[in-house]
Amino acid sequence: MLHSNIIGEGKPLLILHGFLGSGDNWKTFAKKWAEKGRSVHLLDARNHGKSFHSDEFSYEIMSQDVIDYANNQGIDKFDLLGHSMGGKTAQFVAQQFPERVDRLIVVDIASKAYPPHHTEILEALSELDEQQFESRKEAEEFLMPLFPETDLRQFLLKNLERTHEGVLSVKCNLSLFRSHPERIGKALPKEPRIHTPALFIRFESKTFQAVNDTGALGGVAGVGYAVQFDDIPIS
């Protein structure tokens, strides 16, 4: 079963994080939405965060993980928000289990195929893992020349956890991701079509545009590498 952090009470909202992320990436926004009467479930995908590792890793399998989680929690229908990899998983859930999803929000991803583009990050995390640093400061100093963007470094550092030996280790399943990078970018099937009410949000530089199921567009400034916004219409 997927690890989760549940915040608030009310109508369920399930949030699926992006590649190399975890549910906690959305904790700040989950608290705000919980204040509006939502029960926000921050899920860690398999091979990420505190969830289990498995060589089985596909959007079909990850979408079934979401349904299995909802069944275990006694949740029949839910709103679903997915970012990046989580956005593809969310789309697959809406395709295959339309009766379970009330509303769908997809952030910064389409259903098309993407070429592998995380090689540099995965290699850096692998090298960092081998260093067995004892402090996050050491780990950040190691990453700084490779990734000068502070937001990206902080995002990657969230992958670290302290072992029983007192050193920092990468939580995600690096060996799998490095062996099969193509699985992340795989296209979703074109059928069945999604008929769930949906909002698709795309990023353009430091702004993003929102495209909903009626074709309306909107923009919000100030969005960087890590998702940093709270104007998604969830209520």
What is the predicted role of each segment?
Residues L20-T28, V40:
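Serine-hydrolase catalytic-loop signature spanning alpha/beta hydrolases and amidase-signature enzymes
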Residues Q131-L188:
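Conserved alpha/beta-hydrolase catalytic His-Asp/Glu region
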